[in-house]
Amino acid sequence: MSEEITTNQTVEEEQQTNQPRLSNENIKQEDEEQQVQEQQEQQQQEQQEQIDDQDTQQQEDEFVVLEETKPVEPIRPTPTLQETPQQQKQQTQEQEHEYQDIVQFIDHKGDIVKEDNKNGRTTFLSTLSNRDDFLTKGFDYSVISILGPQSSGKSTLLNLLFNTRFAVMDASTGRKQTTQGVWMGVASTTNNKNETFLILDVEGTDGRERGEDEKAFERKTSLFSLALSSVLIINMWAHDIGRYNAANISLLKTVFELNLQLFQKKRNHKILIFFLIRDHDGVTPLERLKATLMEDITKLWTDLQKPEEFVGTRESDFFDFEFTTLPHKIYSPTAFLGQVEQLKQRFSDSGADSFIPKRKYRNDDIPADGFYQFSYQVWETIKSNRDLDLPSQKEMLALYRCDEFVEQSMTQFTRDIKPIKEHIERGRIQEQFGEKSKRILDQSLSVYDEPAQRYHLETVQKKRQVLTDRILTELKYLFDKQMERLNENTLVFYNSLIKEFTDSNTGSSSGSGNNNNKKRDGSSVLLTAASVGIIPQFSTWSNGIKKKSIEYFEIVANQSIVPGSDWSFENDLEQLKIKIDKELSILKENQLVRLSKLMRDKTFQQELTPLLTKITEQAPNNMWQKIKTYYDDALSSNEKEFRDRLVDFQLDEQKVNELINKFREQLADGLKNKITERAEFLQMRMRKRFEEKFNMDNRNLPRKWTKTDDIASIFQDARQNAEKLIDLFSYLRLDEEDSNVSFFKRLDNDEHEENTMVNSSKIIIPYKDCCLACENFRLTIKSDYMQALSEQNRLTSGGGVPGYMIILLCVLGFNEFISIISSPLLLLLTILLGGVGFVLFKLGLAGPFIDYSSQILVHFISKVKDIVLHVEQLQEQNHNNNNNNNNTPKQKRE
C-alpha cells in the first residue's frame, strides 16, 4: 500500500539535496518560494487542527490492513478554506456512497490469498463472484496499476481518483511499509458509471522491510502489473527527476525488459505509461521534466539488450507516454485537490480527448469473467521463476474458461435433448429429428459462444469444435437408434402394404361371383389365384412395394440428419434393401409354392379327379391308356398356363424348367396317390367284377344254373377276370414303355409271380399286398362256387323227394311231431332252426354255412379229443404213481 507524506522536514531535506547552484535570479526565486512555503505551513497547521478535532477516534494500529472486520476509512480530501461545514458533510456523504471494496490478492510472502472464513478474510475470487456488474463487462473494463517508491502516496492517490479504500500510512506513527503484496479493487468513477476499472495497488519499491529480497519481489510484481495493465502509473517525486536510483530508472528498465519478454511471440496492444510527478513546485516546467524523462527513457531503451527481432525498434512501438504533475499535498492542499479532481475527470470522461484509459490500451484477450483465473495463472508462473509467455497464459485462460463453458453448454444440451432421447429409447420414431436436433445444437453452441467469444479466438474455436463433436456424438447415437427403429418401422410399413394388397385382392376375388370361375379363360385363373393369395404380376408389384418402402425410409432418414453433419444413412439403407430383398425372396418362393399348388390342385380337382374316379370305377383293361390320354392333355394345357404365370416372376430359364419339372413330378405323384386311394376298394371292385362275370349271364341277367353249365370254367374265367384288377392297380403306367408291363404276373398253374424288372418307384401296391388281396378274394368267392355246384346237383338228382318217403316220414315221425307240438320249447326251437335253414337256403348260403359249421365241428372235435387224451395221460400217470407206491413197501419187507 501507499503511504501519505506528512513530515515537512523530510520534504525539505530531499528538496535541498536536489537543488542546483543558485544564481541571482535563483536567489530571488528562492525567496519567493520561501514565502509561499511559510504561507503553506501556516495553512497546514490550521487544517491539521481541524483534522485532529474530527478524527479523535482514529485507530491505534500503526497501519490498517483489509483483513480487519471493519473497513478502513479512506483518506478524504482536505476541505478548502472556502468550504462550510455543511458542504463538507454533504461532500463526505456523496463520496462515501461511491467508495469501493478492495481485497488483497498477493500477500507479503508472495502467496495468493486464500479464503479464511474464521478470520473474516475474503479472496478476490469471492469478491468478483458477487460483482455481476463487473463480470458482465466482457472486455469493457480497464486495468490500472501503480508503481513507485514506498511511502510516496500511491494508495492515497488511488483512493482519491477511484473512490477505493486502499489502506494508507499514518505518518504520525512513523514511516513504514503499509501496502504489502498486491491489492485489487473494482471501481467506477462518479461521473461515468459505464467506465469500470480494476485497480492494482502494488507494494512500493525500495522498502527497507524486504532488504536484499526487494529487487526480486519488485521484478515479480512489476512483471505481474505489466502483464495485466492497460495503464501503468509511475508515481515519482519531481525532485528525483535527473537521478538514476531515486527516479526509479531501474524500475523503468525492468518494465522495458519485461515487456520484451512478455511479447516476444505476439504483440497485443500498447501500454500507456502514465508518469505522475508528485510535489511539483512549478519552478521547473512540466515540458522540461517531460523532456528529461523522455531523454532518459530513450537512452534506457537504446542500451537494452534486445532480442534479434526487436533490434531497431523504438520505445514508442510498445508504449505510449503521458506526463502530469501534482503539487504538494500538505503544502498546497487546495491546489492538490483541485488538480486531483481534474485528473479524476480525465479518468472518467471517456468522451474527452484527454481521456487516459482509452479503449486501445485495453487487453481484448481477457474478458472480465476470466480475469481472476488469468491473473492467478500469471502470478503462479511468475512465482515459480518460469518464463512468462503471456500469449500462452491467455490460451491457458481460454482453455480453462472454455472448458467451463463447454460443460455449461453440455448441461443445457442434456436438458434440451432429454425428451427426444426418452422418446427414441422407448422405441418410437422422432419426427423431424434432424431439424429439432439442429435447433438444440445451435442453442447449445450459443450458450458456449456468448461468453467464449471474448477469449483467445483459436482456443475458442478448438473448444467449440470439441463441443460440437461431443454434441454430435450424442446426437449420432440417437440418430443410429432412430435408424434402427426406422429400419424396423419400414419393414412394418412394407408388411402393411402387402397385407393391404392381399386383403383387398382376396376380398375382390371372393365377391366377383362364382360364374366367372366356370370360365376356361385366363380370368378364371387370375380369380382363382387371387382367392388363394397369389399376387398377379408379382415382379412389377414387388418393385413398387420396395420403392414405396425405400421412399418412406429415405423421407424419414433425410429428416433425421442434422444439417451440417457428415452423417449418412447409406449403410442403413443398404441393410434395409437386403432385408426387403430377403423378405421379397421369401414371399416370392411362397408365391411360387402357392402357384405350383394352385396349378396342381386345379389340374386334379377340375380335370383329372372326375375322370380318374370314373375310369377307376369302371377299371377297363385299357384303363391306363385312357388315364395317360387325359393326363397328357391336362399336363400340356396346365403346363402352358404355368409357364405363362411364371413370366410374372421374371425367373431365368433354369428356374422355370426346374419348377415345370417339379410340377410334372408332383402331378405324377398326385396321380399315383390318387390310384393308391382308389385301390383301397380293390376287394369290392374285384368282387363286383367277379359277380358280373359269374352270377350274370350274357344278357346281364342273374344266371340260372343248368345241368349242362361248366361251372368250373365259368368260375375260373370270372376269377381270372377279377384278379386282373390287382395287376391293373398295382403299377403306374404313364410312360409309353410301361403300357404292356405286368407287375402281378399270372402263371399257367393259376398262381402269380412278381415282375422284378420294373421301376420300383412306380409300384402302387407291393407284391405281398397283391398276393394277400388275391388270397382273400379267392376265399370270399369259394362259397359262390360251392353254392353254384349245390344248385346244379339239386337239379341233377331228379324231381325231388319220392311220395312214399313223405308217407313213411309222416307215419314214423308222427310221435316225434306230436311231442314237438306238445312241447313249447321244442316247438320254438324247431321254428327257429327251420327259419334259419330256410333263410340260408334262399340266400344260397347253405353250402358256406355247412362248410363253416363243419370246420367248427372239426375244431370242436379236435379240442375234445385233446382234452380226452390229456385226461388219459393224467390217469396213466396216477396209475403209475400208485404202482410205484405199492412196490415200495414190498421191497422194504423183503
From Swiss-Prot:
Region: Disordered, residue numbers: 1-97
Enzyme class: hydrolase
UniProt topological domain (Lumenal) ranges: 822-824
Amino acid composition bias (Acidic residues), ranges on this chain: 49-65
Cytoplasmic side: 1-800, 846-894
EC number: 3.6.5.-
An individual GO BP term: regulation of endoplasmic reticulum tubular network organization
Coiled-coil spans in chain: 21-60
Protein function: Probable GTP-binding protein that may be involved in cell development.
UniProt protein name: Protein SEY1 homolog
Lineage of the organism: Eukaryota, Amoebozoa, Evosea, Eumycetozoa, Dictyostelia
